[in-house]
Amino acid sequence: MSSSESVENECMCWAARDPSGLLSPHTITRRSVTTDDVSLTITHCGVCYADVIWSRNQHGDSKYPLVPGHEIAGIVTKVGPNVQRFKVGDHVGVGTYVNSCRECEYCNEGQEVNCAKGVFTFNGIDHDGSVTKGGYSSHIVVHERYCYKIPVDYPLESAAPLLCAGITVYAPMMRHNMNQPGKSLGVIGLGGLGHMAVKFGKAFGLSVTVFSTSISKKEEALNLLGAENFVISSDHDQMKALEKSLDFLVDTASGDHAFDPYMSLLKIAGTYVLVGFPSEIKISPANLNLGMRMLAGSVTGGTKITQQMLDFCAAHKIYPNIEVIPIQKINEALERVVKKDIKYRFVIDIKNSLK
């Protein structure tokens, strides 16, 4: 590597050094741009609960120093000679994965998120053996396949959360045909994912009911996000009154909860999609079978549907509700994420604060 390449590849970032999860300034080296790569200056990065999990080694597989961040938005500064879809100056996004085998049935169908050899954007092991570093950094180099075009008139700070929170609910909603005007949707939980499910539901022409254990969420659900109904899920009478009334349910709740009361809300042949991660699922087979209901899980989405979602949000002027912060506030922000003290997604202003 030449001295000029060395300077070009140097990357400022914030990293966790140990399971305390405390982040502080750090410097890493990004790879040089190869034939199919895109290098982008990161302007914004969303803050996801995954950043807490791996910064604090909650799954026991964190590799330090760890640079979080997989909701990345920025501007192209360099492209490899074979790159066809991007040019310098384009607005681009990078989501939860940055590589895959590109040969399996899932990759061939644009479902790279399901590839057995997929590589996470941070704390992953790339195919060259290196550990991936995420978007709490000044720039990143990614194969063009895993980059997304952000429409030029769509704010970069708004695009960032779409690349995890947005696609996590958009993908299953599209997969299970939850875009039928006039149908009814229930959204369980009103955080980063839940508020996007409400926004998509409204854009699809659905009648949306929000379920929460907190009455404090009522005003924002109805008046801020435009849901038609709000239900306290711990209120037996409210839940009973809605039995067999919903076509679809999207469960974004992160904590453990009973499933049967929600399953009873679905009409015959209704669909319940789980995108949260409770420690276990317990459900009555009769509730599932006799109602001919479907229970499905989902994660994020492949490259094809992620690009579709970005275009849809731009066309329909759908924007996540965000709080923009400087990177110097990230440790405080992560604590607030744990405490659910955010409406509804933090976005780091990398461009103006990472110096």
Curated annotation (Swiss-Prot):
Annotated positions binding Zn(2+) 1: C48, H70, E71, C164
The protein, known as: Probable cinnamyl alcohol dehydrogenase 1
Origin organism lineage: Eukaryota, Viridiplantae, Streptophyta, Embryophyta, Tracheophyta
Oligomer status and interactors: Homodimer.
PANTHER family, per database record: ALDEHYDE REDUCTASE
Enzyme class: oxidoreductase
Cited Gene3D superfamilies: Medium-chain alcohol dehydrogenases, catalytic domain, NAD(P)-binding Rossmann-like Domain
Cofactors that this protein relies on: Zn(2+)
GO CC annotation: cytosol
Protein family membership: Belongs to the zinc-containing alcohol dehydrogenase family.
Reactions catalysed: (E)-cinnamyl alcohol + NADP(+) = (E)-cinnamaldehyde + NADPH + H(+); (E)-coniferol + NADP(+) = (E)-coniferaldehyde + NADPH + H(+); (E)-sinapyl alcohol + NADP(+) = (E)-sinapaldehyde + NADPH + H(+); (E)-4-coumaroyl alcohol + NADP(+) = (E)-4-coumaraldehyde + NADPH + H(+)
Gene Ontology terms: biological process: lignin biosynthetic process
Protein's job: Involved in lignin biosynthesis. Catalyzes the final step specific for the production of lignin monomers. Catalyzes the NADPH-dependent reduction of coniferaldehyde, 5-hydroxyconiferaldehyde, sinapaldehyde, 4-coumaraldehyde and caffeyl aldehyde to their respective alcohols.
One Pfam family it belongs to: ADH_N
Pathway(s) the chain acts in: Aromatic compound metabolism; phenylpropanoid biosynthesis
Species this protein is from: Arabidopsis thaliana
GTP-binding recorded as keyword: no
Tissue specificity as recorded in UniProt: Expressed in the vasculature of the primary root and elongation regions. Expressed in the hypocotyl, cotyledon veins, vasculature of the first rosette leaves, hydathodes and at the base of the trichomes. In stems, expressed in the vascular cambium, interfascicular cambium developing xylem and cortex region. Expressed in the style, the vascular strands of the sepals pollen and anthers in flowers, in the abscission and stigmatic regions of siliques and seed funicule and testa.
